[in-house]
A protein has these predicted regions:
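Short alpha-helical transmembrane segments in multi-pass integral membrane proteins
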Residues: 1-27, 84-151, 195-249, 308-373, ...
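Small-residue-rich hydrophobic transmembrane alpha-helices
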Residues: 56-116, 153-172, 282-344, 377-399, ...
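Hydrophobic transmembrane alpha-helices of multi-pass small-molecule transporters
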Residues: 68-71, 183-187, 213-217, 292-295, ...
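Short runs within selected transmembrane alpha-helices of multi-pass transporters and secretion channels
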Residues: 77, 145-164, 172-180, 201-214, ...
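Interfacial/gating helices of multi-pass transporter permease domains
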Residues: 25, 47-67, 134-138, 198, ...
Length: 464
């Protein structure tokens, strides 16, 4: 437990450390953590693509369900994290422990729900995209393993957030890193040595998650004295569960919107492009590669949000505005780097997925076209973090909903159908740039509203 003096020192850092240095200090561990998560996202696809392109399609079609699972895990954990941090700040250890216990209980319930989906819904989900039997069979095997052993990812994320809620983020980096390394080592073993293909990739993934979960439990028991979980007398609390989801549901919905978008985008690509399943592979490769650009920006957001929130509470207007400006600039730097890489090196990037000449024919122009969207994406993600800092997550949800469902899917459908009629698959990829531009306009309008109502009325100060 930190002493009162240490708490004051930590608070002073948020209010007095030079903003640029503070952003780097707060965000760098989060950025590293997010890059590890991005590695998790890509490694299965890289190894599976070495088997054949149909196997890559099977994994790509599984992604929306897999992503939704992670969304439920992280969304629930976000609520638990926030409530525990608040309870500990109030010196209410009993409440913090009960919230943690209810969080673990919800992780168990969620894993049971996805287990049932894996057993009974996997084949139906994959077959709703394609009629190719090999892809249906392989995709079903992949989802059944990932969902069947989903307790690994649910408990891993929950116990990692328990560590984060007490400020022990270093241990979460260890658990994620160990899980990712195990996954990378075991993927080629199960896929090629044991000749298990796509199913082997899924087994390697869940083993990595389970090991990370066990490690996270160990760190909580031995390195996290602020929380003491005791399930002998545990009873679920409707009040605590309601509080958890009141905070966590917006995060879950944000991910759910992304999963719905990916599901329909896959259906559009198969139905209305000449490349069909190969177009899905290009889209899947883009999604995995994109995470290496977007995940660091999300990590930046995770570091920036408490800085803005603290200085808003302290009414330090100058520091708030400087933090917002720098976060947008840094996010755009990441995005511009991504745009350059996607535009200049599409063949190299697709090579990670063992791209065939036909996939390169579709993928090279696709990545070049999509690279334009990065110019808008960075600022959009950064402003999403700003909205959360002021408790205005609804603005982030509006922007995300408009981008992914109101603009992207309808425009992709129109461009894909028109492109099919003239024999041009490239048009569909412009839907991303159009959607990101629209989302940026919405985010800017929302920020102007927020600035006028919340930031502008604050009295000017002379602090750095």
């Amino acid at each position: 437990m930190q002493s009162k003096g240490e708490d004051v020192l930590e608070e002073n850092k948020m209010g007095v450390m030079p903003v640029n240095k503070l952003i780097i200090n707060m965000s760098l561990p989060m950025i590293i953590s997010m890059l590890v998560q991005a590695l998790y996202n890509i490694v299965d696809s890289v190894f599976v693509a070495m088997v054949n392109q149909e196997s890559l399609t099977a994994v790509s079609l599984s992604f929306p369900a897999q992503n939704l699972m992670i969304g439920f895990a992280t969304g629930t954990a976000v609520g638990v994290n926030a409530l525990i941090s608040r309870a500990l700040g109030e010196k209410n250890s009993e409440r913090a422990n009960k919230i943690a216990e209810n969080g673990v209980f919800l992780a168990l319930l969620s894993s049971i729900a996805f287990f049932l989906f894996g057993v009974f819904g996997s084949r139906l989900f994959i077959s709703s995209h394609t009629s190719v039997q090999y892809i249906i069979d392989e995709g079903t095997k992949y989802l059944q393993v990932c969902c069947g052993a989903s307790f690994g990812i649910f408990f891993e994320i929950m116990y990692e957030r328990l560590l984060q809620s007490t400020g022990r983020t270093f241990y979460t980096m260890i658990t994620q890193g160990v899980g990712a390394i195990i996954n990378i080592i075991l993927d080629p073993v199960f896929i090629f040595v044991f000749k298990m293909g796509v199913q082997g990739a899924a087994i390697a993934t869940v083993i990595g998650q389970i090991v990370a979960f066990i490690l996270a439990v160990y760190f909580n028991r031995h390195k996290n004295p602020d929380l003491h979980l005791d399930f002998k007398k545990f009873k679920p609390s409707g009040r605590f569960i309601g509080e958890i989801y009141k905070i966590g549901v917006p995060s879950i919905l944000m991910v759910a919107i992304g999963s719905v978008m990916t599901y329909f985008m896959n259906k559009i690509l198969i139905a209305y492009t000449l490349g069909k399943e190969l177009s899905v592979n290009v889209f899947g490769a883009f999604f995995k590669l994109n995470s290496f650009i977007c995940m660091p920006i999300f990590g930046l957001n995770n570091g920036v949000i408490p800085i803005i929130a603290y200085n808003y509470g302290a009414m330090k207007k100058h520091r708030m505005i400087k933090t917002i400006k720098l976060s947008v600039v840094y996010a755009e730097v990441f995005s511009i780097i991504g745009a350059i890489l996607f535009f200049a090196l599409p063949k190299v990037l697709l090579g990670f997925f063992s791209a065939t000449p036909e996939m390169l024919r579709i993928g090279i122009p696709a990545l070049k076209i999509i690279s334009v969207s990065f110019l808008f994406a960075g600022a959009n993600i950064a402003l999403s973090g700003v909205f959360q800092s002021f408790g205005k997550s609804i603005f982030s949800m509006i922007s995300s909903f408009i981008r992914q469902l109101v603009v992207l899917i309808p425009i992709a459908y129109i461009l894909a159908r028109y492109g099919l009629s003239i024999g041009n698959d490239n048009l569909v990829w412009w839907s991303y740039s159009i959607a990101d531009f629209a989302a940026s306009v919405v985010s800017i309008v929302c920020f102007i509203v927020l600035y006028k109502k919340i930031i502008k009325p604050i009295r000017n100060d002379q602090t750095e």
